[in-house]
């Protein structure tokens, strides 16, 4: 990851994002995951800048990461009035998240293979 004012995704990070996307993960989710995996904690605004995403895209991605149990959020109170700042961090290391993702994808492949086998059996009756 390159450092400007905040961290930004580099070519290697972008390649990881593309691979996750090729495997069916939404690109914004992949960008967010890769970005926060390289930070101890990061604010929503950091993810927006570093991963080149808009606030709603980060919000949706973070909801999914939290739903999967891969990330957690805490609110950082600012002095004075105003909304708190959301700070995020992963709850599991990226290699463990990849293992879970791989398992999900292998299950999908298994189900596809099973459906194709069943379809093959049904279609073989039509040829007669």
Predicted region positions:
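Amphipathic alpha-helical dimerization/coiled-coil segments
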Residues: 92-128
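Canonical helix-turn-helix DNA-binding module
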Residues: 45-85
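N-terminal start-of-chain detector that recognizes signal peptides
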Residues: 4-8, 20, 43-44, 58-63, ...
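Short, cationic-aromatic polyanion-contact patches
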Residues: 18-28, 43, 76-98
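N-terminal helix-turn-helix DNA-binding core of bacterial DNA-binding proteins
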Residues: 19-53
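N-terminal leader segment of winged-helix/HTH proteins
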Residues: 1-23, 79
């Amino acid at each position: 990851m390159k450092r400007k004012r905040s961290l930004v995704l580099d070519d290697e990070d972008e390649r990881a994002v593309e691979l996750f996307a090729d495997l069916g993960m939404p690109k914004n989710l992949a960008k967010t995951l890769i970005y926060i995996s390289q930070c101890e904690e990061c604010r929503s605004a950091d993810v927006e800048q570093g991963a080149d995403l808009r606030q709603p895209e980060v919000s949706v991605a973070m909801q999914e990461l939290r739903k999967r149990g891969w990330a957690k959020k805490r609110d950082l109170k600012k002095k004075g009035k105003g909304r708190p700042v959301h700070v995020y961090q992963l709850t599991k290391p990226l290699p463990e998240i990849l293992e879970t993702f791989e398992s999900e994808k292998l299950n999908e492949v298994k189900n596809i293979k099973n459906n194709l086998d069943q379809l093959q059996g049904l279609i073989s009756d039509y040829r007669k």
